[in-house]
């Protein structure tokens, strides 16, 4: 069984390899995804300026149970997040992005987020 530290270290190595080849420009900024245990965080980043242009996370959309933080680690929250990031990017005049999956497999929540962002009008 692979322990969590080993999995995370492997993902970090994959992500650094991907980042060497990928760069967000003002014309096509980078759509970066971070997946925690309970939430997803998405940013549209212009790497030439080193600035975050648009950001969203599932903390904004999850349903909170009594006395607890909202949950956002599921497919429905990922779909809502994809639509929200696409809408916010379009408001800033961003239509095309480069998708940076952050070393995560293109499966599950990451795939749902990407598909929803495409449905929302982002091209990648």
Swiss-Prot record:
Pfam families: Ribosomal_L18p (PF00861). GO terms for biological process: translation. Signal peptide: none annotated. GO terms for cellular component: cytosolic large ribosomal subunit. Keywords: Ribonucleoprotein, Ribosomal protein, RNA-binding, rRNA-binding. GO terms for molecular function: 5S rRNA binding; structural constituent of ribosome. SUPFAM superfamilies: Translational machinery components (SSF53137). Gene3D superfamilies: 3.30.420.100. CDD domains: Ribosomal_L18_L5e (cd00432). HAMAP family: Ribosomal_uL18_B. This is one of the proteins that bind and probably mediate the attachment of the 5S RNA into the large ribosomal subunit, where it forms part of the central protuberance. Belongs to the universal ribosomal protein uL18 family. Part of the 50S ribosomal subunit; part of the 5S rRNA/L5/L18/L25 subcomplex. Contacts the 5S and 23S rRNAs. This is Large ribosomal subunit protein uL18. It comes from Koribacter versatilis (strain Ellin345). The gene is rplR.
